[in-house]
């Protein structure tokens, strides 16, 4: 049904089905990388059905044309360029050489290309994020598998241990970029979605051959609200003219017929909706990226779905150290995704495991420092000869030095006893 680009359609649909169940998605990501391309593929299917199984164009033919000629005119005017002349305007050679309407034949292919453009940023992100220490998709998949195999508490503890090992690798690494590799890739993904929306607008402008990027607002006002489609609409004209020549008795006769573009009425509604949807996606994605950038840079604690100060052995100072030095940017980003996918309760259980390891490490470090700095009792020596037999004393078989523990030396009268 889709002709030579049918395999592209099937491959794109398969990719969207795989992406539907991806864990490493927030709502805005799903709108960009799954919902919008899915709608574009559905639009492609609807327009293709009209082109191949319906009657996309219907032309008024002269009376002398038979039924076979009618079919020929319809097909010819669909595959050849048509042009738009407003009602009440004389059809001149200048009008014939004006703006031709030829985009409608390529709409299904262009829609598939636009859907692929929406999917591309996610697949580029998926290619690079696998090399990061904190693998968002891999970590979430690990937690999902643990919840299926183990008890929830055990799964959260196991996942906390896995995260802690990753965070320890980051802290022990000499490369300071390891702490926010996943965060940088995440922002590049968001930026890719924004750039894609801009490129989509540029593509629409050139594909539809319009004068500016605000064509959607002007079209909606002038055509839909004012009802001047027959006079002013040259973007999605309902009625177009088509020129063709017929050879009869060795001579060519040119005919000009008026055609109703039934397909254009469908394309118009779809593209107007898609135009304003692009604006909505652009605004939402940009606002979401700015909001998350502010949180991850200046209010990282707001990304943690629990109050760390209420945890055992935690206080504001330790909470700040835990977020800044231990979780870092990538750890906070991962916990944000865990909260979005598995809920605040499971995330709080995972954080409990991380905090337990954090406090144990701090306590062990502080105990080691205390043992090195504490005061040890001074050791003194004293001569003790009262109990030494004279024969052993003479042979010096017994040491004359005895260690005595205490804060001070023994009294002087005990040290000065005669030997």
Curated annotation (Swiss-Prot):
One of its GO terms (cellular component) is gap junction. InterPro entries: Innexin (IPR000990). It is a multi-pass membrane protein. It comes from the Eukaryota. It holds the Pfam family Innexin. Keywords: Cell junction, Cell membrane, Gap junction, Ion channel, Ion transport, Membrane, Transmembrane, Transmembrane helix, Transport. One of its GO terms (biological process) is monoatomic ion transmembrane transport. Its main location: membrane. Disulfide bonds: none annotated. It is found in: Cell membrane; Cell junction, Gap junction. The chain crosses the membrane at residues 33-53, 108-128, 184-204, 270-290. Belongs to the pannexin family. Structural component of the gap junctions. This is Innexin-2. It comes from Caenorhabditis elegans. The lineage of its organism: Eukaryota, Metazoa, Ecdysozoa, Nematoda, Chromadorea. The gene is inx-2.
